[in-house]
Regions:
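Acidic helix N-cap motif at the loop->helix transition within catalytic regions
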Residues: 10-13, 38-46, 88, 92
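Short, acidic, metal-binding catalytic loop of nucleotide-sugar glycosyltransferases
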Residues: 17-26
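A conserved acidic beta->alpha catalytic loop
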Residues: 18, 33-42, 84
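Short beta-strand/loop segment that forms part of the nucleotide-sugar
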Residues: 26-35, 55-59, 85
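Glycine-rich, basic loop-to-helix element that forms the pyrophosphate-binding segment
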Residues: 59-75, 96
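Conserved nucleotide-sugar donor-binding catalytic segment
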Residues: 73, 129-184
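Short aromatic/hydrophobic "clamp" motif used to bind/position activated sugar donors
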Residues: 80
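Conserved donor NDP-sugar-binding/catalytic core segment of glycosyltransferases
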Residues: 92-126
Length: 184
C-alpha cells in the first residue's frame, strides 16, 4: 500500500486502522510524509513502532506526485495499492484485489466501488460523481467513459508495479496525476 500523507493528523489513525485490519496477511504499507506541518509525522512514527508492516518515509513538501514517486522507489511488492490518508479500506479490499490480479494477468490494475463519508456530509455533486463511478462495472464501461472524467477513484486502485514503471510512473503536468496515468 502506498499512502502519501500531508497534514493528515485528523484522519490518519482511522486510515491506518483500516489497513491493519486487512484480511490479506502479507503486505507492506509505505507511508510518505510530504513535509507535514501538523502531527502527521508523530502519528506515523507511533504507528511504525507497533506495526511492522508500516515503513515511514519523509520528504520535504513537494506535492502528491513527488511524494508518490518517492514512495514508489521503496515499494517491493508486485502489486501497489493506492490509498490516501483520509480514506478507509474495507477489510477484504487488498485480498480481493490481489486475487483478481493473480487470476487476470492480462489486466494492469483493478479498482473497487467507493462510498463517500462521513454520512450526511457528502455534497450533492460529489454524491453524483460517486454514483457515476460505481456504475462503471466493466472494462467497456471504463473505456466508454474515460474521456468524460477520471473513471477510476485513485485511492481504490491496485496496480501492477511493473506496468506502472513501464508507462513512466506518475508525472506532473498540472492536472490530476491519476487521470494522466489512466490516459497513458
Amino acid at each position: 500500500v502506498l499512502m502519501p500523507c500531508y497534514n493528515a493528523a485528523a484522519t490518519l489513525d482511522e486510515a491506518l486502522s483500516s489497513l491493519v485490519q486487512q484480511t490479506l496477511p502479507d503486505f507492506e504499507i509505505i507511508a510518505v510524509d510530504d513535509g507535514s506541518a501538523d502531527a502527521t509525522s508523530g502519528i506515523l512514527r507511533d504507528w511504525a513502532s507497533r506495526e511492522p508492516r508500516l515503513r515511514v518515509l519523509s520528504c520535504s513538501h513537494a506535492g502528491i506526485v513527488e511524494a508518490i514517486n518517492f514512495g514508489l522507489q521503496a515499494c517491493t511488492a508486485d502489486y501497489i495499492a493506492r490509498m490516501d490518508a483520509d480514506d478507509l479500506a474495507r477489510p477484504e479490499r487488498l485480498e480481493l484485489q490481489a486475487a483478481y490480479l493473480d487470476a487476470h494477468p492480462e489486466d494492469c490494475l483493478v479498482s473497487c466501488r467507493v462510498a463517500g463519508f462521513p454520512d450526511g456530509q457528502v455534497r450533492e455533486g460529489f454524491s453524483i460523481y460517486i454514483d457515476w463511478l460505481n456504475s462503471l462495472l466493466s472494462d467497456e464501461d471504463i473505456r466508454r467513459e474515460i474521456f468524460v472524467e477520471s473513471p477510476l477513484p485513485h485511492p481504490s486502485v491496485m496496480l501492477r508495479r511493473e506496468w506502472l514503471q513501464r508507462v513512466g510512473g506518475y508525472q506532473e503536468h498540472g492536472w490530476a496525476e491519476d487521470y494522466d496515468l489512466w490516459l497513458r
